[in-house]
Amino acid sequence: MANQVSNVINSMRLKRLQKQLVAVNRLSDQMRNCSDEALQAKTADFKQRLEKRETTLDKLLPEAYATIREASKRVLGMYPKDVQVMGAIVMHQGNIAEMQTGEGKTLTATMPLYLNALTGKSAFLITTNDYLANRDFQEMRPLYEWLGLTASLGFVDIPDYEYAENEKQMLYNHDIIYTTNGRLGFDYLFDNLADHINAKYLPELNFAIIDEVDSIILDAAQTPLVISGAPRVQSNLFHIIKMFVETLVEDEHFKLNVNKKEVWLTDEGIDVANHYFKVNNIYLPQYFDLVRVINLSLRAKYLFKDNLDYFIYNGEVVLIDRITGRMLPGTKLQSGLHQAIEAKEGVELSQDLSVMATITFQNLFKLFNGFSGMTGTGKLGEKEFFDLYSKLVVEIPTNHPIIRNDKEDRVYAKSDEKNKAILEKVKEIHATKQPVLLITRTAEAAEYFSTQLFKDNIPNNLLIAQNVAKEAQMIAEAGQLGAVTVSTSMAGRGTDIKLGSGVYELGGLAVIINEHMENSRVDRQLRGRSGRQGDPGVSQIYVSLDDYIVKRWSNSKLAENKKLKDVDPDKLQDSPFFRRRVRGIVSKAQRVSEETSMMAREMANEFEKSIGIQRDRVYEERNRILETSDFSAFDFDSLARDVFDYDLRTKHIHNKDDIINYIYEQLSFSFKDDAISQQIQTREQTIDYLVQQFNKQLKENMKIANNDYFKLRFFQKAILKAIDVEWINQVDQLQQLKASVNNRQNGQRNAIFEYHKVALETYEMMLINIKRATIRNLCLSILTFDKDQDLVVHFP
């Protein structure tokens, strides 16, 4: 019933698109009759009309799409089909176009990119890896340039490349920019650490199209991009608390929900902790670090498994990517969790680096004035797209009907029986010369099957998501006659598999998947490797009760039935009851996995709200300071007065000696206290006196920064230094706070409420600290000049 309703709604959306498609098609003959010069002149005409506000992008769409459509035929030899135009209309509207593999998403994206770039603001195409960004840029660049727009790759595609001064500005100073989500995210964070307006390089984030949009803003939505700073002071609690955690009993001292990745102390567990560490209440503010490390140690012990989430290599904890199965050397969990795992495994603790800046992909793309996306599997994530981003998903019809045969799952009790059956099936298909693509969840499984096939004299290509460019070429050849390719689920994504000569008659590409993935969208993506553009094809998933998804997400007793695993697999295969039960178990496990992931993303989104609002305000203030060309109207007296008033109310400043010490610490290293006692009798008089000392010291520094340019740079540097130091402290504190409270959702406190409450309190304290640090920087900094007579500021 739900599918029927969804199909009806999609049909209604397609009908609305048809009206605009007709308008585009109506202009086809007109554009076809244009000379090259006349067609190229359209871009300048469109820009002028938009600039004069004679039209809008929506009104211009039919004409602009018809223009680039005709240009594409002349420059690239490709004329976008009607279904591609429909997908392009959906994306200009800011929604998600679901387009199947091989339907030409790369060409489709050129239309909304061209239209939105006509405003004079940059339009971005964002994809998942460097290879795809570079490939699509190189293919489409001639089209944009022929039409008079500039296009660039937003990075230099050389490993460990060091950018020259102003090189980033040149890369981003284009109408259309191709880049990746990771590179754009880090560029955004670094751009907002610039200490001079000329050092900033990102253009206005106006419009973006995200390729593989579900992978980037759903699956990776809660993955934070982090710029790490100086090492934190290492806590000596990890080893002590590791021993404490080992004394705790599940259900009595702590509760555990593996599916939701939650673990928290019970009331009795809190009492045990109070007694163990000899404190009245571990949740008092002074014991924040104690609670933080207890929670980290509980998570390390019960939610992270050796050889599944990480393994020990050369005395170090090396993380494993659960999706690809690849190890991630050099990558570390944040906020002390990595150190908690190291303590658990008894290896040397690595440095826990502080966090300088962070943002999630979810918040990154919300910075754009508008963004849209394209994917082959958007419909399955439609609810979440709408709930999180207010995006509709429109399923675009394929240009040719899909005739791929998606067979029922083959089910087994044991994994070794399943693996044996998979190898036999590959041999059987290979004997006919039909190409086979065997897809696994992990690199380890892919290597196993590849090795076994070689032992059986079946040559094969192994792709385990290591060399993207090389693997893209290999996956493209997977449709050739007699080809056998073994691949992880992530390898070669974004590359079409075209059928070689004689393969169509054999039934197209055969896709065998060795287990269901944790997300049904990924299953569908993998099946979609076969049967592109109306080609024949076949796909089948093999499952067993030993599969990861069953062990991780199912609580079915059937999965633990040891007697079942002794039954002849052929008999089980012939049992409709067994097949139905196993499919039901796998289906439910996948549903639990998807719901849990969705809840985790919702939770991450809630946690991200506070830091997102704070980050926007801090970066807005940074930009205001960078863009200020004259500080003569800046009210430093009020700033100083706020700080002095706060400090006199909250610090122990009661007598002459306290005031003198305060002046030495905050205002002047050369203060002379001759007449201090006669001038200050009340708090207001003390504040007035401190403001007087502030102005006196500031004037001394102005004698050194003795022209308008030096004064401007000094004020900017002093204020930005204060903002950056305190904001870095705030970000790091919020990261640690999140790790500390994240476990308490089912405990005595509401984790989100507590997090936002403390985040607001620490933000308000940060504002005072920024003001104080600004005053201190203005007064106590030492100003010198380098050999080029440029001002150098040595901060206190």
Curated annotation (Swiss-Prot):
Cell cycle in keyword set: no
Function in brief: Part of the Sec protein translocase complex. Interacts with the SecYEG preprotein conducting channel. Has a central role in coupling the hydrolysis of ATP to the transfer of proteins into and across the cell membrane, serving as an ATP-driven molecular motor driving the stepwise translocation of polypeptide chains across the membrane.
Name used for this protein in its record: Protein translocase subunit SecA 2
Any Pfam family hit: SecA_SW
Species this protein is from: Staphylococcus haemolyticus (strain JCSC1435)
Membrane topology, from the record: Peripheral membrane protein
Biological process annotations from GO: intracellular protein transmembrane transport; protein import; protein targeting; protein transport by the Sec complex
SUPFAM superfamilies on file: Helical scaffold and wing domains of SecA, P-loop containing nucleoside triphosphate hydrolases, Pre-protein crosslinking domain of SecA
UniProt xrefs under NCBIfam families: PRK09200.1, secA2
